[in-house]
Amino acid sequence: MNPYILTPDLNGEGLHIGIVRARFNEEIGQAQLQACLEELGKLGVDERDVMVVSVPGALELGVALARMAESYEFDALIALGAVIRGETYHFEVVSNESAAAISRIALETGIPVANGVLTVDTDEQAQARAAGKGADCAQVAVEMANLAAALEPEEDDEDEDDEDEDFDDEEDDGR
């Protein structure tokens, strides 16, 4: 057996990336954003092809991400922010609902969304993870944008029965 294997592609040239950053826990979000933008540049994404918007908090990420995804102007999106545990149940609500919204947007629109919302117990944990998570999200966005493009069905106007692009060379005899 010789399967067709798509390898990770971290070439960001020509990609359009949208970033939505939650302003709550501003210092953490800024560190994430800076690391994310630096990594996107290293991966070849032109700064003119990146749009950054900010929203008040993690629960508002979904609305902005949905609007950006629905515009189909972006190859991938990135959500950045931090939810730090407090003394109430609010932490669980914000963590769960923001993660669910991010996943739902990606699945419903087919636009990859890298989830960079940190969910941590302390400010120190968030600070320690912020830059790394921002850079990771840049890599995830580029890789998933390229994967989504590679998996996009090609329109073949000339011959719908052309099987040159099939993964296996065996003819289907209808059985």
UniProtKB/Swiss-Prot annotation:
Keyword Transferase assigned: yes
Pfam family, one: DMRL_synthase
Alphabetic keyword roster: Riboflavin biosynthesis, Transferase
The keyword Methyltransferase appears for this protein: no
Domain of life: Bacteria
GO CC terms of this entry: cytosol; riboflavin synthase complex
Bias type Acidic residues, positions: 152-175
Family per record: Belongs to the DMRL synthase family.
Protein known as: 6,7-dimethyl-8-ribityllumazine synthase
Organismal lineage: Bacteria, Pseudomonadati, Pseudomonadota, Betaproteobacteria, Burkholderiales
